[in-house]
Structures are given as C-alpha cells and as structure tokens.
Amino acid sequence: MFLQVEMYLSFKKKYSMKTNFNFNSVLQIWNDYKVLFVFSDDNRVSCRLSFYNDTPQDAIISDLYVHESIRKQGGATAILNWCFEYAKDRGCNSVSLRSDNDDWVREWYKRLDFKVISSQVWLTKNI
C-alpha cells in the first residue's frame, strides 16, 4: 500500500553552461520508501530519485533518460544537479546509482565525482 502525495516543484535554474531546464516532480510515498519522479517541462529529460527509510542518508538515482534530440546539451547534468540539491536539502550525504558497463558512461559519471564502489556480473540460464 502506498500513499501518493503529488508535489510539483517547478523552477528554472541554470545548471548547465549550454541551456536552462525547468524541472517538475511528483512524489510518491510508500511505507518504507519515497520515490520522486523528476522530469523536464517537455518530458525529454527524466529520472527517479528514491529515498529508503533504512538508509535515510543515501538517495538512489535510477532511470536517467535524455531524449536523443537533446543529448550532449547539458540535460543529464542539469537533472542530476537538481537531484543532488534536492537530496542534500533533505539531509542526504550521498547519492548512488547503478550504471551499465560502458566506458563512456562510467567516465561521464566520474567527471561528476561519482566513485565506482563495486561491479556486478549478470548471469542467465536458458530454460
């Protein structure tokens, strides 16, 4: 069971040297965690920011998406910076995420001061 609380946070702030993005959010609250869906006005940049009750000092970013027509224009950096600020304002001292094993993506996250703390291997079995 969850209690949905809609909260639209909208503001313009220059997070990127190339462009301004206006972000909105919707917050959903369950018993043991909260999820903030963050998206640009035109829905071409979006992600989820989760907060779990058992690790309140850490926020988790997932499902980062930037439409191909605006990639490499600062949208991903802008929405991540929005998430960093939002999480910090709520008492978090770290933000975590999982990334594909792609050198370019991993290096991009490192430029944003993310540190690799583990690696995973996905296994499959035909049945």
Regions found by a protein language model. Give the residues of each.
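Alpha-helical interaction/dimerization surfaces of two-component signaling modules
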Residues: 11-14, 86, 108, 112
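Short hydrophobic/aromatic beta-strand or adjacent loop that forms the aromatic wall/cage
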Residues: 33-35, 117-122
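Short amphipathic alpha-helix that is part of the acyltransferase structural core
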Residues: 1-42
